[in-house]
């Protein structure tokens, strides 16, 4: 049964052009070619990268964040309340107005007190600034290393500058060691990102990030198995060229170096727009749609490859819109307000609210309505603070 399923899955009539068979992609005469089973090595490597990442964050990024003055915002914990906690965990973090009124009645609280409890409870679950700094530090180091390695591997290759050469003598293109190791490293990294996604900072484009990671993993595995490494390597290098700039911008933002953060964000935006909205459709999509079938008639693998690339392009357009929103805010207000994808810190209470609307914490219990807050202006100042950072792809 397994043999039949494997034969059906790797049917050469599906994945390869006419008159091309898997036998032609076997190693021969000292030449090495990609094999689908090679991609299995990426799984243990991804697990190793997860270990390396948490080691890096714990022993390098965390001390570095303290040395650079990154400090977490002090958050007031929500008062223990079994009824509100049950609703928060079971029915949602943001109750409707009718649910809020019902919960307030059940708990003997005012509507403002109930709203304040949910605000504080949501803020408790939001990642701290140090955690974000550590995540971005790891991604910055890895993206930068991948971009440098990819540039070194591809710089002298003719298809880097002339994408149509990706299809010369296809699929009889021997696998070079440098390209193999870089490709496997990229695949392992994206698998590790998928593994740690539940533990990473969640943003409003979480679903789009999941789609992106899945599509990228499938695209890398698929292109490797079908010896489409040339065009696949161009896609990877194009993406790596902007990602490290984004993470660098975030790092400076967490350090509150506003001018450096804004400058890097503008540079990132220009690189992103040029690589994702200009080069990707005109150089990558054009050659995969039209130039790739110069010597072959369309086949299933051709359509599958282009569907994956179009999905990536749609994600590029989506993220470009978010970046444009950030740039509009920058032009209008003179600095980056916040990431439009961010799960931002909510204000504990506005300056005009009375103390009774959001009771202050004292020894784990709420003060009676009308009582003066114990921390005075500091609580209002902390309440105004929001978590700001730039968007990621």
UniProtKB/Swiss-Prot annotation:
One of its GO terms (cellular component) is endoplasmic reticulum membrane. The keyword Coiled coil does not apply. It catalyses: sphinganine + octadecanoyl-CoA = N-(octadecanoyl)-sphinganine + CoA + H(+); eicosanoyl-CoA + sphinganine = N-eicosanoylsphinganine + CoA + H(+); docosanoyl-CoA + sphinganine = N-docosanoylsphinganine + CoA + H(+); tetracosanoyl-CoA + sphinganine = N-tetracosanoylsphinganine + CoA + H(+). The last loop motif confers selectivity toward stearoyl-CoA (octadecanoyl-CoA; C18:0-CoA) to behenoyl-CoA (docosanoyl-CoA; C22:0-CoA) as acyl donors. Keywords: Endoplasmic reticulum, Glycoprotein, Lipid biosynthesis, Lipid metabolism, Membrane, Phosphoprotein, Transferase, Transmembrane, Transmembrane helix. Residues 131-332 form the TLC domain. Ceramide synthase that catalyzes formation of ceramide from sphinganine and acyl-CoA substrates, with high selectivity toward long and very-long chains (C18:0-C22:0) as acyl donor. Glycans are attached at residue 19. InterPro entries: HD (IPR001356), Homeodomain-like_sf (IPR009057), Lag1/Lac1-like (IPR016439), TLC-dom (IPR006634). This is Ceramide synthase 4. Gene3D superfamilies: Homeodomain-like. GO terms for biological process: ceramide biosynthetic process. Its EC number is 2.3.1.-, 2.3.1.24. It comes from Bos taurus. It is found in: Endoplasmic reticulum membrane. It is a multi-pass membrane protein. Residues 325-393 are cytoplasmic. PROSITE patterns: TLC (PS50922). Residues 346-356 have a biased composition (Acidic residues). Pathway: Lipid metabolism; sphingolipid metabolism. A motif (Last loop motif) lies at residues 291-301. The keyword Transferase applies. Residues 346-393 are annotated as: Disordered.
């Amino acid at each position: 049964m397994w043999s039949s399923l494997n034969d059906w899955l790797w049917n050469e009539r599906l994945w390869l052009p006419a008159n091309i068979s898997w036998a032609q992609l076997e190693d021969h005469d000292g030449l090495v070619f990609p094999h689908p089973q090679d991609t299995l090595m990426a799984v243990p490597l991804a697990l190793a990268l997860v270990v390396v990442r948490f080691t890096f964050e714990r022993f390098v990024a965390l001390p570095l964040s303290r040395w650079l003055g990154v400090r977490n915002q002090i958050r007031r914990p929500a008062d223990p309340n079994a009824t509100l906690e049950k609703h928060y965990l079971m029915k949602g973090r943001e109750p409707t107005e009718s649910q809020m009124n019902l919960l307030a009645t059940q708990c003997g609280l005012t509507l403002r007190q109930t709203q304040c409890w949910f605000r504080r409870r949501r803020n408790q679950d939001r990642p701290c600034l140090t955690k974000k700094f550590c995540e971005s530090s790891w991604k910055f180091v890895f993206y930068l290393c991948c971009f440098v390695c990819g540039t070194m591997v591809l710089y002298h290759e003719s298809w880097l500058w002339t994408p149509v050469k990706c299809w010369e003598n296809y699929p009889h293109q021997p696998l070079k060691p440098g390209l193999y190791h870089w490709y496997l490293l990229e695949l392992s990294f994206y698998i590790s990102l998928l593994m740690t996604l539940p533990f990473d900072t969640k943003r409003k484009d979480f679903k789009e990030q999941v789609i992106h990671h899945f599509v990228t993993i499938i695209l890398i595995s698929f292109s490797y198995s079908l010896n489409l490494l040339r065009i696949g390597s161009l896609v990877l290098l194009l993406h790596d060229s902007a990602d490290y700039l984004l993470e660098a911008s975030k790092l400076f933002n967490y350090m509150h170096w506003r001018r450096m953060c804004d400058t890097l964000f503008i540079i990132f935006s220009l690189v992103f727009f040029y690589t994702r909205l200009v080069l990707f459709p005109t150089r990558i999509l054009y050659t995969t749609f039209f130039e790739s079938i110069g010597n072959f008639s369309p086949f299933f693998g051709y359509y599958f490859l282009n569907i994956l690339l179009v999905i990536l392009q749609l994600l590029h357009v989506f993220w470009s819109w978010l970046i444009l929103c950030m740039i509009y805010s920058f032009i209008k207000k003179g600095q980056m307000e916040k990431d439009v994808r961010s799960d931002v810190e909510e204000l504990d209470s506005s300056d005009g609210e009375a103390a009774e609307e959001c009771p202050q914490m004292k020894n784990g219990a709420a003060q009676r309505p009308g009582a003066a807050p114990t921390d005075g202006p500091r609580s209002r100042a902390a309440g105004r603070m929001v978590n700001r950072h730039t968007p990621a792809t």
